């Protein structure tokens, strides 16, 4: 048996990774918008649903990682079992009714509870597949160079996530317009769109481990103290602290959809597609750069120095983007501002994408280090740190966003009024009644990310070589 993966295994892994990311992008890009702005659950409840579910899910990730690392099953067993349930639960997350003052209190309570229950179950099931797929390259080959190459191709999955992020909302808006444009029509349009993306994503996700061979056997520990690695392994400890300090970088994904919808597009499907693409192209370019350049850059400068550098660079374009809005609060759609915004988001997206890829490489190095230290190789546990970082960030960002909405008094009734205003031809960014909301959206999109980029670089600021 060869010591590294075949071309077919590589292709199937990337295909499955793309499918998993389509599902992930579908949920993370529009669920918060759907709950608050389509089915009109009050912002405070949406913030609690998303933050509590995400924080709970993040906290339990290391325990699921430890369970997988200690278990008798191979990673591929999880990757074969999880895709179809994940796709079904994705659809169920968008199956709620519409929250309304005209509903009875029990009905509204049921709508809120069902949103919470379906989402938290989705999080648990998704994690059971996410941890194995993140760590799968580490068991497909014992060659560190080949492993780095495959891990560096993970941005291909991110591109698939980017495509779903770009497409889901504009498609749903277009379908809603065809159906009639009411709140019920928009709800049904999202349900149909999400169903289509769930089927495509689940089908591709299923390919991940079919026919693959795990060439590196995890040295499984039978003791129950594996969580000590988060303290005793210096690399895992640093990247976990860095991730927690940088939690609010996830605000970009939380705020992007309402920012595009209400400031730039006024719920126009074509403009939603254009401006989501404008904001998203930076991430896609960054993913391409990650796949092409991270192996050589990390070899030349070291992963720790590279990680610190891209996070520090990311501070400045975020600050400049907010300053641009402060200068032109109603005119960000003018050509000069649009060009400047495109350049800034290109830099931001590139920094975020490179940072995420390098983070994965550092965790892989932490696994190798642990094997040298203790002769244990808990791949799943260590890669659960990355899912923990993502989820705790999204949870805290969702909570912060809901507090912000409450601060500007933007609740369920105000959302319905804003939707009616747009339906009657209004443009929110040009109306003084919504200036506080527009400022809040830009502020949340940029300032927490700048602060978190600085904080996440601190554990690696000394930049020692690998």
Model-identified regions with their sequence ranges:
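Membrane-embedded alpha-helical bundles of multi-pass transporters/translocases
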Residues: 2-466
């Amino acid at each position: 048996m060869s010591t590294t993966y075949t071309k077919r295994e590589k292709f199937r892994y990337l295909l499955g990774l793309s499918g998993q990311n389509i599902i992930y992008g579908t949920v993370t890009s529009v669920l918060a918008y759907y709950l608050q702005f389509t089915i009109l659950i009050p912002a405070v409840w949406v913030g609690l649903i998303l933050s509590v579910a995400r924080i709970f899910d993040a906290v339990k990730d290391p325990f699921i990682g430890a369970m997988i690392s200690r278990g008798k099953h191979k990673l591929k067993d999880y990757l074969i079992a999880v895709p179809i349930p994940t796709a079904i639960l994705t659809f169920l997350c968008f199956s709620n009714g519409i929250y309304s003052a005209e509903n009875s209190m029990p009905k509204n309570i049921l709508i809120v509870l069902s949103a919470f229950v379906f989402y938290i179950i989705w999080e648990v099931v998704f994690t059971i597949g996410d941890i194995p797929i993140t760590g799968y390259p580490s068991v497909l080959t014992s060659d560190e160079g080949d492993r780095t190459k495959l891990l560096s191709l993970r941005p291909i999955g991110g591109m698939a996530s980017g495509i779903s992020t770009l497409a889901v909302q504009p498609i749903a808006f277009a379908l809603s317009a065809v159906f009639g444009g009411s709140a019920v029509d928009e709800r049904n349009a999202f349900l149909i769109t999400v169903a289509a993306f769930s089927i495509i994503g689940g089908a591709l996700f299923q390919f991940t481990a079919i026919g693959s061979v795990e060439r590196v056997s995890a040295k499984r520990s039978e003791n129950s103290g594996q969580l000590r690695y988060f303290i005793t392994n210096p690399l895992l400890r640093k990247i976990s602290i860095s991730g927690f300090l940088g939690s609010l970088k996830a605000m970009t994904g939380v705020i992007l959809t309402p920012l595009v919808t209400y400031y730039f597009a006024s719920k126009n499907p074509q403009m939603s597609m254009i401006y989501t693409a404008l904001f998203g192209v930076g991430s896609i370019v960054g993913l391409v750069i990650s796949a092409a350049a991270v192996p050589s850059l990390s070899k030349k400068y070291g992963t720790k120095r590279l990680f610190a550098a891209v996070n520090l660079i990311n501070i400045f374009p975020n600050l400049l983007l907010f300053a641009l809005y402060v200068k032109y609060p109603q005119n960000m759609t003018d050509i000069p501002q649009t060009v400047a915004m495109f350049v800034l988001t290109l830099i931001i997206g590139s920094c975020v994408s490179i940072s995420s890829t390098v983070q994965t490489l550092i965790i892989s190095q932490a696994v190798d280090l642990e094997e040298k230290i203790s002769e244990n190789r808990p791949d799943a546990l260590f890669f659960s740190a990355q899912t923990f970082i993502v989820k705790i960030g999204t949870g805290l960002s969702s909570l912060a966003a809901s507090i912000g909405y409450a601060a500007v008094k933007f609740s369920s009734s105000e959302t319905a009024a804003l939707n009616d205003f747009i339906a009657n031809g209004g443009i929110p960014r040009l109306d003084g009644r919504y200036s506080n909301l527009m400022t809040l959206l830009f502020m949340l999109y940029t300032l927490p990310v700048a602060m978190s980029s600085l904080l996440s670089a601190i554990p690696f600021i000394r930049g020692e070589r690998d």
